[in-house]
Curated annotation (Swiss-Prot):
Component of the cytosolic Fe/S protein assembly machinery. Required for maturation of extramitochondrial Fe/S proteins. May play a role in the transfer of pre-assembled Fe/S clusters to target apoproteins. Residues 434-461 are annotated as: Disordered. GO terms for biological process: iron-sulfur cluster assembly. This is Cytosolic Fe-S cluster assembly factor nar1. It holds the Pfam family Fe_hyd_lg_C. The keyword Iron applies. The lineage of its organism: Eukaryota, Fungi, Dikarya, Ascomycota, Pezizomycotina. It comes from Penicillium rubens (strain ATCC 28089 / DSM 1075 / NRRL 1951 / Wisconsin 54-1255). [4Fe-4S] cluster 1 binds at C20, C62, C65, C68. Keywords: 4Fe-4S, Iron, Iron-sulfur, Metal-binding. The keyword Iron applies. [4Fe-4S] cluster 2 binds at C215, C270, C473, C477. GO terms for molecular function: 4 iron, 4 sulfur cluster binding; iron-sulfur cluster binding; metal ion binding.
Length: 604
C-alpha cells in the first residue's frame, strides 16, 4: 500500500477549506480615529475589545464560496434540522381546510390569516433505510412516516398548536417525470445534428456527454472546482426540486395562498440536499411571473427544509413519539385529505413496478437505465453490452444495432474518486499561447493505468458518451450520508432486538457492507399485494404509452398554472468564485466599481 494512504482517506467526504468567506474569528479593526499617528505602537493589552455580533454562516453563503468543495455536515445539520421543523410547527398555526364540492378549500378563520400549510415529500431511499432499521417492508416504512408526520400519534400529539403535515407525497412521482424528460433531453441532444460535443451551438441543450444533475454534492463540486463541466450538466430539476415546484405552484393557486405560506419539508438520504434546497435558482422567482403586488418581495424556496433519515429519528424522539409503536397502516381519511386539484392528483399517484425498480436501475433513481431502455425500445433488435469498470461504481453501456454498430454509449460513475477520473477525461485540451500552435492532445487516461481483463476501455476521451449518471456517494443514494447507520440502529433499537454486539462498538467494514446490502434489498423490494395490481397496469402500457401519459400530465400542469413548462422543470447552474486570496484593498475595490460603472454606461 502506498505510504500516502491512510485510514482517513477511505471515504469520499472532502473537508471544508480553511479559507472561508465567513470567518468565525475576527481581527481587531484598524483604529481610524488617529490616522495621523501612523507610527504609534499599540500593545495587545491596550486594544479595546468590541461587542461584535456572532458570526452566522448560511447555506447560501456556502453556495457562494469556493473555499470548500462540500460543506461540513455540522453546518448543514445546524441550519436545517429536526429542530427547525419543530420550531416552525410551533411558530405558526396550521391553516384549516374545508371539504367543498369541487375539492378542498381554505377555511377563512384567524388561523388562516397567520398560519401555514405544511407539506412533505419523502424519497424511497429513506423508506428503505427505515425498513431495514425496523425490519419491516418498504411500504410499511412509508406508512410509518405518514403516521409520524400526519397522524394523531405522531407530531400532532404534541407542540404548541398540535400541527402536522397535511400532505405527504412520494418523490417517485416526480422522478417518473424527470426520467421521461431525461430521455427527451438525450434524444434532442443526439438529434441536434452535431456529432461533436464541442461543436454543439444550441445553448438550450447541454453539451454531450450529458451529465446527470440530481446529486447536489456532485453539482457543488462541479460549480466550485470544474466550471468547464457546467455546459454538460442536465438542465432538469431533481425530483426533490420538482416536487417542491409542483406542490408550491398547484397549492398556492388552488387554495389562493401565497407560496410563502406553504412550508415544504423534504426527507432525503443526503445532507447535501440541504444545499440544493438553498439554491437561489430553486425559488418561486424562477416560475412566478408578473406578481409584483403585495409586500412579498423575497424569493420563496420551493423546498423550505430538508432532513435526513437519521434526523427523522431525532424528530420523533424530540416529540416523544416512538416510531416502532406507530400504526403500520394507511392514515385515516380525516388526516389524509384529497389533493385540491383533482386533474393533477393523478400526478402524485405515479408509482414504479418491480420491473422498473430492479438491480439494473441502480439505487439512485434509474436515470441511466431509463435512457437505455427508451433507446432500446426505439431500436428493435438492438442489444445492450455491459462493460464493468475497475470497481463496481463504474459501468459502461453500449447499445448495439443488429448489424453490430453502436447506437448509444453511456456510463455510470459513482463516488468522488471515480468522478475525478471522469472529469479528467472531459477536461478540454490546453490551448497553446504560441501563435499557430495546435492544441495539446490530452491523454485519454491522464496517467499510466494498468488494464484489467474486465475493465472499461480508457481509449475514449469520454466525449463519445451520450449520457453519464453521476452520483457522489459510492454505491448510490441508498448509501447517502444521512441514512441510518448500523450504530444508529443499535442505539435506536436497543439490546431487546437481539443485538449481541455492544451498541458503542464501531461496526466492521463487513457489517457496514451487509447493512448497505439490506438497505438495497429493501429499496428494490415491493409489497406483494401492490405488486400484482401495479404489474397488471404496467403490462398494459408500453414504454411509449407511459411517456405519452406523463407528457400529458406535464402539459396539464403547465396549462393549469399558465406557465411555460420550461420554467417549471428546468434550472440553471453557475460558476462559483470567491474573493479569497484576491486583492481586497480599497484601491482595487474602487477600480472594480469604476469598471462596472463604465460597462453599464455610468461614471462620474
Amino acid at each position: 500500500m502506498s505510504a500516502i494512504l491512510s485510514a482517513d482517506d477511505l471515504n469520499d467526504f472532502i473537508s471544508p477549506g480553511v479559507a472561508c468567506i465567513k470567518p468565525v474569528e475576527t481581527l481587531p479593526p484598524k483604529d481610524t480615529k488617529n490616522q495621523e499617528d501612523a507610527y504609534e505602537v499599540t500593545t495587545e493589552d491596550k486594544v479595546q475589545p468590541e461587542d461584535l455580533p456572532p458570526a452566522q454562516i448560511s447555506l447560501t453563503d456556502c453556495l457562494a464560496c469556493s473555499g470548500c468543495v462540500t460543506s461540513a455536515e455540522a453546518v448543514l445539520i445546524s441550519l436545517q434540522s429536526h429542530a427547525e421543523v419543530l420550531n416552525t410547527l410551533d411558530a405558526h398555526p396550521e391553516i384549516p381546510l374545508t371539504h367543498e364540492p369541487h375539492g378542498v378549500g381554505v377555511n377563512n378563520t384567524e388561523d388562516s390569516k397567520e398560519g401555514k400549510i405544511f407539506v412533505a415529500s419523502v424519497s424511497p431511499q429513506v423508506r428503505a433505510s427505515l425498513a431495514t432499521t425496523y425490519g419491516i417492508s418498504e411500504k410499511e416504512a412509508g406508512y410509518m412516516i405518514d403516521q409520524l408526520l400526519s397522524g394523531p400519534q405522531g407530531l400532532r400529539g404534541g407542540g404548541k398548536h398540535g400541527n402536522g403535515f397535511t400532505w405527504v407525497v412520494d418523490t417517485n412521482a416526480m422522478r417518473e417525470a424527470v426520467l421521461v424528460l431525461t430521455a427527451d433531453e438525450v434524444s434532442d441532444s443526439l438529434n441536434s445534428g452535431e456529432s461533436s460535443a464541442m461543436s454543439q451551438s444550441d445553448d438550450s441543450l447541454p453539451k454531450r456527454p450529458i451529465l446527470s444533475s440530481a446529486c447536489p454534492g456532485w453539482i457543488c463540486y462541479a460549480e466550485k472546482t470544474h466550471p468547464f463541466i457546467l455546459p454538460h450538466l442536465s438542465r432538469l430539476k431533481s425530483p426533490q426540486a420538482l416536487s417542491g415546484t409542483f406542490l408550491k405552484t398547484v397549492l398556492s393557486k388552488s387554495l389562493g395562498v401565497h407560496p410563502s405560506r406553504i412550508w415544504h419539508l423534504a426527507v432525503m438520504p443526503c445532507f447535501d440536499k440541504k444545499l440544493e434546497a438553498s439554491r437561489e435558482e430553486l425559488t418561486d422567482m424562477s416560475w412566478r411571473q408578473g406578481d409584483s403586488s403585495g409586500s412579498e418581495s423575497q424569493p420563496v424556496r420551493d423546498v423550505d427544509c430538508v432532513i435526513t433519515a437519521r434526523e427523522l429519528l431525532s424528530l420523533a424522539s424530540s416529540r416523544g413519539s416512538s416510531l416502532r409503536d406507530l400504526p403500520l397502516q394507511p392514515l385515516h381519511s380525516s388526516f389524509n385529505p384529497p389533493f385540491p386539484e383533482k386533474t393533477l392528483d393523478s400526478f402524485l399517484s405515479l408509482k414504479r413496478s418491480r420491473a422498473e425498480q430492479s438491480l439494473a436501475t441502480g439505487t439512485s433513481g434509474g436515470y441511466l437505465h431509463h435512457v437505455l431502455m427508451t433507446f432500446q425500445a426505439r431500436n428493435p433488435g438492438s442489444e445492450l453490452v455491459v462493460n464493468r469498470g475497475r470497481n463496481v461504481d463504474v459501468v459502461e453501456y453500449v447499445l448495439m444495432s443488429p448489424e453490430g454498430q453502436p447506437i448509444l454509449k453511456a456510463a455510470r460513475y459513482y463516488g468522488f474518486r471515480n468522478i475525478q477520473n471522469l472529469v479528467r477525461k472531459l477536461k478540454p485540451a490546453r490551448v497553446s499561447r504560441l501563435p499557430g500552435a495546435k492544441p495539446a492532445v490530452r491523454p485519454a487516461a491522464g496517467r499510466r493505468q494498468p488494464m484489467s481483463r474486465n475493465a472499461v476501455s480508457t481509449g475514449s476521451s469520454g466525449s463519445d458518451y451520450a449520457y453519464v449518471e453521476v452520483m457522489a456517494c459510492p454505491g448510490g443514494c441508498t448509501n447517502g450520508g444521512g441514512q441510518i447507520r448500523v450504530e444508529d440502529a443499535r442505539e435506536t433499537l436497543g439490546p431487546s432486538q437481539g443485538e449481541s454486539l455492544d451498541a458503542s462498538m464501531k461496526p466492521s467494514p463487513h457489517e457496514q457492507r451487509a447493512w448497505l446490502a439490506r438497505v438495497d434489498e429493501a429499496y428494490f423490494s415491493m409489497d406483494s399485494e401492490s405488486e400484482s395490481e401495479l404489474e397488471t397496469q404496467s403490462q398494459l402500457l408500453s414504454l411509449a404509452d407511459k411517456e405519452a401519459k406523463i407528457h400529458e400530465r406535464l402539459r396539464s400542469w403547465s396549462e393549469y398554472m399558465n406557465i411555460p413548462l420550461s420554467k417549471l422543470v428546468y434550472t440553471t447552474y453557475r460558476k462559483v468564485e470567491s474573493d479569497v486570496g484576491k486583492d481586497q484593498t480599497p484601491a482595487n475595490d474602487t477600480s472594480r466599481v469604476v469598471e462596472l460603472a463604465g460597462k453599464i454606461g455610468g461614471g462620474w
